[in-house]
Amino acid sequence: MRDKIKLVSTAGTGYYYTTTKNKRTMPGKMEIKKFDPKVRQHVIFKEAKIK
């Protein structure tokens, strides 16, 4: 079962991506480096719940 998650920027801009994750293969919190257009840099995005 793939669950929807939100990837929030650690730069503090409030920018986020939404994606899906397979909880069986990745039980931990996801961290991925992606582009944040507000700061025009690649920063680490951390997993958060979609409310």
Curated annotation (Swiss-Prot):
SUPFAM superfamilies: Zn-binding ribosomal proteins
Superkingdom per UniProt: Bacteria
Presence of keyword Ribosomal protein: yes
Entries under PANTHER family matching the protein: 54S RIBOSOMAL PROTEIN L39, MITOCHONDRIAL (PTHR15238), LARGE RIBOSOMAL SUBUNIT PROTEIN BL33M (PTHR15238:SF1)
Keyword vocabulary terms for this entry: Ribonucleoprotein, Ribosomal protein
Name of the molecule in the record: Large ribosomal subunit protein bL33
Taxonomic lineage from the root: Bacteria, Pseudomonadati, Pseudomonadota, Gammaproteobacteria, Moraxellales
A cellular component annotation (GO) from this entry: cytosolic large ribosomal subunit
Species name: Psychrobacter arcticus (strain DSM 17307 / VKM B-2377 / 273-4)
Record Pfam families: Ribosomal_L33
Single GO MF descriptor: structural constituent of ribosome
GO biological process: translation
Family membership noted in the UniProt record: Belongs to the bacterial ribosomal protein bL33 family.
PROSITE patterns: RIBOSOMAL_L33
